[in-house]
Regions:
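Phosphate/adenylate-binding glycine loop and adjacent helical scaffold
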Residues: 112, 347-438, 446-450
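C-terminal helix/juxtamembrane-tail motif
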Residues: 157, 168, 180, 184, ...
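A long, amphipathic alpha-helix that forms part
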Residues: 4, 24, 37, 41-44, ...
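Structural motif
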Residues: 51-53, 208-212, 261, 287
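Active-site-proximal alpha/beta segments of enzymes that process anionic O-linked groups
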Residues: 5-19, 28, 46-51, 58-206, ...
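Alpha-helical transmembrane segments of integral membrane proteins
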Residues: 9-24, 439-932
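Divalent metal-coordination and catalytic microenvironments
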Residues: 55, 104, 211, 241, ...
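Histidine-centered active-site microenvironments of extracellular/periplasmic hydrolases
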Residues: 256, 262-305, 312, 316
Length: 932
């Protein structure tokens, strides 16, 4: 028991620290404070800017022609062909609203730590175009508009928003959200005629009008981007943008000082989701016109070979693509305000209609603003590094050379050549900035890797000492064993030296943990060094080196297979084939071996199926419900036949669950039908769905703790909320997984040679004598296999119906039985429950397995921890912060999942223990609660 608690406490601390280490190593915040502001020292091209962001609008949907050859957005298309500039704005992962708006208006890509606040807030205040403007008026959703009112000490941002409750995915007409914005804007301009203060403010320069349009995002989620609702919403936006331009021209008497930018924060998948890095999510439209914006130009060689322009019939008009963050310096230059100090955007000079001199000066201002970040970051690194260890950016000489070239070209008025040199200079400065942001990466990575290896080595030695019979105390091991006194001296000396070294360098607080943890772990390993020599002597004494080497190679190959499954979902099917063939190498009966193989092959079909996206098949769902009812009816009959009796509580629970299943699919089908017909979510369905979600898992606690009965009731209890979220083949996967878990329990029990029948076993709390027996338990090679199977089935449960990259593939209709109003955290919680229910089934089956064969829980979980950390170490070095945004998101997800296996395993085992051993019982009028 003490071993389990100690290893668990140390392991939890290590994993929590290393879990967050990637945010210091790979994803540091790009925000630097105390920087100077730079603005173009020339007259501004525009006095005001209208920024229109159509949330969730895909580039192809607004640019492409319909089947009849007409466009969905005639006004916007006329701007492209007659008086403006256009292109694609490429966003970054995560393709969510907040990061997209921050990139647009502040010019930098948010650090991943913002995910802890649901991408709804940033841990650090930041500069933006709005901060630098004289006045900003914003209309739209509160979540987006109020992003930029935080820290508005100058009271320059005036927000007009609607409540989040208005965002309903089942709304009959979600485009009314956009109509509301346009109506408020029109009323705003009309009120200026009677409001002298407002009229005076509107006559100033450096003004921004921000229109956030959420209708397209809402319709896309509710009906998908190929729906008529989405297309009609595009047409509505197009008509109202034309009206906005007319209103502004009338108010300002066509003074030609208004610039317009129309874009989107992110796109959307075909099934109505966003968040990942598919092209449909990262490619958004950009159309700019008005003051300071270049006129329509016929296309020359623009360097784009993706075929988009031709497909959209726009190849005649020059296209200029940008990164989303590039729009912040563009807006700042148009208004003549300082570029946001943390902006990483490169000014797209081709969008400006000014001469080459203005372009060169504007781009030079952009270069100075980025160079200021570079110098400050370099200074920060120097402040925390000993001069003898400081490694300067290698391209500093190139930077000096480019600086001299810029100055020479500008003096000679060779502005076009100067623009090219300045762009190279900015590119170099950005590389230097990235270099210093990653300055400590190698050192920290080595420290974390040493910590991983130290932890795994310590756990292996712990297993060898306490759960094997190799400790015979040979003379060699006794002579090599470190005394506690020496262990303490080494730990204190090394830790003190490191702390002094880090404090002198003013290292961040978390760095102490990253460097101290490996020292502590390896000191513990040195203390257990006698185990290593005993193991070596054991291998030498019994001449099993080659056998051990072969097993080690097999184990590594098996773990590498786990790593590959994170990248290629179908590999799980191959693994299930091998696992299905395993019983044929044992003494198991042929009938059971064939049943196991059939179950594994059936389960292996699901990773080969497409991930569940926008597909709906409620007929299949009903058929699955009938199969579930039949399966559990047969199970109930079998239990009565084998035991000769069945408790009233169990019978009532099973009967109640079976009667609920048809109702579940009725609610699910009617809820989705009502939403599709724009009739909204029925209140009765919603209330009952929430009640079933909360109360159903509790029903299993009223059954007895008999192993089979409790598992049957637990399966039914968890299946009820799971079915409420099913839209395709998920329940069939759930049923197959339950069947395989049942077979696994039976097989392991038969192989254990236990004389006690499974039907007679209960989930009882282990007595002290049993625990004492488990302390002296010696692990076998078969136990390594059991731990591997558990980890493999956990991955199958997690990714059996979903996308291996992220949870992005889940359809929003999965929670239509519960809600349609936009509540991101509640929606995420519901989807998380859907994902975690199969994991809980595997954990409960593993709990039953451990109970039936009486092995040491601690030993098996230590084996699981070693395996999960082996995969985590892989993903730690496979994390990416460059390349495609999809790859970046996948690498983070893989690492977090593999690291979370340690915590998930412990949490799910504890939850499984509670659900299998805890009972609630009614006896007369007395309510009893007992823990067996």
């Amino acid at each position: 028991m003490l071993i389990s608690v100690f290893a668990g406490a140390v392991g939890l601390a290590v994993h929590v620290v290393f879990l967050f280490s990637i945010f210091d190593i790979y994803f540091k915040s790009p925000i630097i404070h105390g920087l100077p502001a730079y603005e173009v020292p020339l007259p501004a091209p525009a006095s005001r800017l209208v920024l229109i962001v159509a949330d969730g609008l895909r580039a192809d949907k607004v640019f492409e022609l319909q089947k009849n050859g007409t466009t969905r957005a005639p006004y916007l298309r006329s701007i492209i062909t007659e008086k403006g500039s256009w292109g694609i704005s490429h966003t970054r992962v995560p393709t969510e609203s907040r990061p997209g708006h921050v990139a647009l208006i502040a010019g930098f890509y948010e650090d991943v730590s913002a995910v802890t606040k649901g991408w709804k807030d940033n841990p650090v205040e930041f500069d933006s175009v709005f901060n630098r403007s004289r006045y900003v008026w914003a209309w739209g959703a509160a979540d987006m508009v109020h992003l930029f009112t935080k820290g508005d000490h100058g009271k320059r941002v005036f927000a007009c928003t609607y409540d989040n409750d208005e965002v309903d995915f089942a709304d009959e007409d979600a485009s009314r959200l956009d109509t509301w914005v346009f109506a408020k804007f029109e009323a705003f301009l009309a009120s200026a005629s009677t409001n002298k203060t407002l009229k005076h403010m509107l006559q100033q320069d450096k003004l921004v009008f921000f229109l956030h349009l959420l209708g397209l995002d809402t319709n896309g989620h509710g009906y998908n981007p190929d729906s008529m609702e989405y297309y009609e919403n595009i047409a509505l936006v197009d008509r109202n943008i034309k009206r906005v331009v007319q209103l502004i021209d009338e108010y300002y008497q066509e003074d030609g000082k208004t610039a317009y930018i129309f874009t989107s924060d992110h796109g959307m998948t075909d099934w109505g989701n966003h968040g990942a890095g598919n092209p449909s999510e990262t490619e958004t439209p950009l159309i700019a016109w008005g003051a300071g914006i270049g006129q329509t130009r016929l296309s020359g060689k623009d360097g784009y070979y993706d075929g988009y322009s031709e497909a959209w019939n726009l190849s005649l008009y020059r296209r200029v693509d940008v990164k989303q963050a590039d729009l912040a310096p563009l807006m700042a230059v148009l208004l003549g305000i300082p570029i946001p100090i943390n902006s990483l955007g490169l000014l797209p000079v081709e969008y400006l209609n000014r001469d080459s001199h203005f372009r060169a000066v504007a781009l030079l201002t952009n270069a100075r603003q980025i160079l200021a970040q570079f110098k400050q970051q370099e200074h920060n690194v120097q402040e925390t590094t000993f001069s003898i260890f400081f490694r300067q950016f290698k391209a500093d000489a190139k930077k000096i050379e480019l600086t001299e070239m810029m100055e020479t070209l500008l003096k000679q008025s060779r502005y076009k050549e100067a623009v090219q040199v300045i762009e190279k200079f900015i590119e170099l400065a950005l590389k230097g900035l990235t270099y210093y942001q990653k300055y400590d990466r190698l050192t920290l990575s080595i420290a974390v890797a040493l910590g991983f290896v130290g932890w795994m080595t310590f756990v292996i030695l712990l297993l060898l000492r306490n759960y094997t019979g190799i400790m015979c105390k040979s003379l060699e091991s006794q002579s090599k064993k470190m005394t506690p006194e020496w262990q303490g001296k080494i730990k204190i000396l090394s830790s003190s030296t490191l702390v002094i070294f880090l404090s002198i360098q003013n290292a961040p607080f978390m760095y102490y943990f990253y460097f101290l943890i490996p020292i502590v772990l390896w000191t513990m390993v040195l203390y257990e060094l006698d185990v290593y020599y005993e193991a070596k002597a054991y291998l030498r004494r019994f001449e099993v080196k080659m056998w051990f080497l072969a097993l080690a190679v097999l184990a590594v190959l098996g773990l590498e297979l786990l790593v590959i499954t994170f990248f290629y979902r179908g590999v799980m099917s191959l693994g299930l084939v091998f696992i299905g063939l395993w019983p044929f190498t044992t003494q198991l009966s042929k009938r059971m071996s064939v049943a196991w193989l059939a179950g594994c092959l059936a389960l292996g079909v699901f990773p080969l199926l497409p991930v569940i996206g926008k597909q709906h098949n409620y007929t299949l769902c009903v058929a699955q419900a009938e199969s579930v009812c039949l399966y559990h009816t047969l199970t109930l009959a079998l239990s009565v036949w084998q035991r000769g009796s069945f408790s009233k509580a169990n019978f009532f629970h099973v009967l109640l669950s079976l009667r609920i299943f048809p109702l579940i699919f009725y609610f699910s089908k009617t809820s989705n039908a009502n939403i599709e017909h724009k009739e909204g979510l029925p209140l009765f369905n919603q209330i009952l769905s929430w009640l079933l979600l909360v109360l159903s898992p509790v029903l299993c606690l009223f059954s007895t703790t008999s192993l089979f009965n409790r598992l049957l009731n637990l399966t039914l209890s968890l299946l009820v909320p799971f079915l409420l979220m099913c839209i395709f083949y998920e329940s069939l996967f759930f049923l197959t997984l339950c069947l395989v878990m049942f077979l696994w329990i039976c097989i392991e029990h038969q192989l254990s040679g236990s004389t006690l029948r499974l039907q007679d076993m209960t989930f009882e709390y282990q007595s002290s004598s049993t625990q004492a027996k488990n302390v002296t338990y010696h692990i076998k090679i078969d136990d390594v296999r059991k731990a591997y199977f558990f980890m493999f089935f956990m991955l199958v449960a997690f990714y059996g119906t979903g996308n291996i990259a992220s949870l992005n593939s889940f359809s929003i209709s999965s929670f239509y039985c519960f809600m349609t109003v936009f509540r991101p955290f509640t929606m995420a919680a519901i989807l998380l429950i859907k994902v975690l229910i199969p994991l809980l089934i595997v954990s409960c089956a593993f709990r039953a397995l451990l109970q039936s064969i009486r092995v040491s829980n601690t030993a098996l979980f230590l084996l699981v921890f070693i395996m999960s950390d082996f995969t985590a170490l892989h993903f730690f070095f496979l994390i990416k912060d460059s390349g495609s945004w999809l790859d970046i998101g996948m690498s983070i997800s893989h690492y977090l999942l593999s690291m979370g296996m340690f915590i998930f395993t412990a949490v799910f085992h504890g939850l499984a223990w509670f659900l299998t051993t805890f009972s609630l019982d009614f006896s007369g009028h007395e309510f009893k609660r007992h823990l067996l």
